[in-house]
Amino acid sequence: RQRQMCIRDRVYKHMDIGSAKIRPEEMEGVPHHLIDILEPWEEFHVVVFQKHCLECMEQIYDRSHIPILVGGTGFYIQAVLRGIDFTENEENTEYRKKLELLAEEQGPESLHEMLKKVDPVSAENIHANNIKRTIRALEYYELTGEPISVHNEREKERTSPYNFSYFVLTDDREKLYARIEDRIDEMMSQGLVDEVRQLKDMGCRKGMTSMQGLGYKEILEYLDGECSLEDAVYTLKRDTRHFAKRQLTWFRRESEVTWIDKGRFDYNEEKILEYMIRELGEKEIYEKQ
């Protein structure tokens, strides 16, 4: 068993607290991949992730181990499991620059309103502040005349080349939201503001992919004098709750998902693990020694 992260922020060095990056002592000797592989100013998106992930998986299979994809970015997981082909998505640099300028002059909401008109499904799933994804969706529509959400649904029907199990752990919504708020309070006490300040001193700015992550864009707005720290934390908690809701909506649309309600297992991790191993055995993916 070797784990690969499907969480964008964890690929970046110097971004530990806001991404809740696993510490070496927590890995328990299990190799973890796609952690600390990029500098914060480097570009990262699903195509780059897919390439890195598939390369790691080949290496893991060559060692007769089983890769475990861990994380909450459903589209990234789908890109690997379904082998989504991104080669047809040629970039329209001139149109992209036009959209980037529009976002700079009129704010990200202006792009999001444009997206609502041509692709309401994508607009529902993409946060208004996620300029990169909004531009990518608009660019795809400009190039093809088809909403990227239609393309993504079509790609979901691809047959996966892998024999896999897809587990989604869920919980009572109020408990989930309470954990989110507690986690953010903990990140603040661990020094999230200082971490973002260090990134800013290194030259990281709002438009960078790394700074689009939850926790980073809100605190950066505070450090840039755009809001108070109290407002930044409030926005972070609200947007993280909304993100969790969108995650669950995404996973509900996925096929072949095994839902695990932690409450039904009395929040006992050993019981949950035994259940997972039993399913892996039934699918002949893993045999317990």
What feature does the model see in each segment?
Residues R1-Q4, R8-Q289:
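Phosphate/pyrophosphate-binding catalytic cores of soluble transferases and nucleic-acid-acting enzymes
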